[in-house]
Amino acid sequence: MRNIIYFILLLFSCTGYALETINIECGRADPTPIAVNKFDADTSTNNIVGHDVVKVISNDLKLSGLFHPISSASFIEDKTGIEDKPLFAAWRQINASLLVNGEVKKLESGKLKISFILWDTLLEKQLVGEILEVPENLWRRAAHKIADKIYEKITGDAGYFDTKIVYVSESSSLPKIKRIALMDYDGANNKYLTNGTSLVLTPRFARSVDKIFYVSYATKRRALIYEKDLKTGKESIVSDFAGISFAPRFSPDGRKAVMSIAKNGSTHIYEIDLATKQLHKLTDGFGINTSPSYSPDGKKIVYNSDRNGVPQLYIMNSDGSNVKRISFGGGSYAAPSWSPRGDYIAFTKITRGEDGSKTFNIGIMKAYPQDDENSERIITSGYLVESPCWSPNGRVIMFAKGWPSRAKVPGKNKIFAIDLTGHNEREIITPEDASDPEWSMVLN
């Protein structure tokens, strides 16, 4: 995926910032007004590309909840491109704190050269500028890369727009047909990876992002873990261990993976060496231990266990030692997922009302709370919310959300994203019902 070449574009000096860095861990703040101006182009075809690039950049920034793209109908200045300084007063007049100018040109190699500059209209200074050289079919990725650069410059955190989501697509009609699908983080470029002839579950990205792993009941005998190469389309069986019900999660170095395997009435966490295929049992005793997830440094594993009667969350060293319970609230905990930043753990929590009805919740808690500290925070609830996963910058959580069947209308499942703060919940549009999302690392 190394098809995008960067060059720093510095046309004017940049010495200061009028805008304060956005703290995305705080509560809701007013989005920063930004104008994404029309991109200049050298041909009518590239004029269309430039228009589409502007749409993608604007949509990325809007979806983040941290920016307010101003409608082009409000623009006063008609000057475009990157050769001259903008008329900053005209942009301040429409309350644009930030301005993006850019251009699209075709190189002799056939590639596109997409350039942009981000301006601070208050200090009248360039904040960042770059040139990207990309194959014509990767213009959308270039737009995501530009949005990533803008997001990073203003928030101080890496962007997450040039990423992929792998998930389980479900037909709305009965019987449901499930297929593994792949899409851009915003729902674009949806592609089916399996044909729907067998039950598939829990797709996971390998560390390389060029491969995925998933569970399939293709033989109807037992669950098998499959590996699929996204470049070649080839797939193979990774393991044929009896008792597997979820795909593994991989260590940060990509050499090992953890999974749960049911044997003799108990379910335990095992680590597998991907080179030798050797298994090492990490938990013991009776009960059900599932949903392991590595810490970003690979030294710890979080998982859920009902060893004390009710499913709770536990952390242990990656060799199975030093087990410590970290959840103490009422309800049942499941599906822990460690933030890529290492600071938080996301989870699903099931609580019951006085009438016995269930409520599903997505929450976060500190990975390393102080003694007796209750760091748990619920960020969304519903009839069915589950399977949380993190954006690569650890500031957005994606999850599956379901609704019940009513009066001959079948229930539905969709994928949503929400900020770490619990604000800006939004649906990720998919062609069919969707569940079990997994977020990739930022693409190369």
Curated annotation (Swiss-Prot):
TM spans (from-to): none
Keyword Cell cycle: yes
Pfam families: PD40 (PF07676), TolB_N (PF04052)
Keywords, ordered alphabetically: Cell cycle, Cell division, Periplasm, Signal
Cell division keyword on record: yes
A GO biological-process term: protein import
Signal peptide (residue range): 1-18
Principal subcellular localisation of the protein: periplasm
Subcellular location: Periplasm
GO CC, one annotated term: periplasmic space
The protein's role, per its UniProt record: Part of the Tol-Pal system, which plays a role in outer membrane invagination during cell division and is important for maintaining outer membrane integrity.
Sequence similarity: Belongs to the TolB family.
Summary of subunit composition and partner proteins: The Tol-Pal system is composed of five core proteins: the inner membrane proteins TolA, TolQ and TolR, the periplasmic protein TolB and the outer membrane protein Pal. They form a network linking the inner and outer membranes and the peptidoglycan layer.
PANTHER family referenced in this protein's UniProt entry, alphabetically: PROTEIN TOLB, PROTEIN TOLB HOMOLOG
Protein name, per record: Tol-Pal system protein TolB
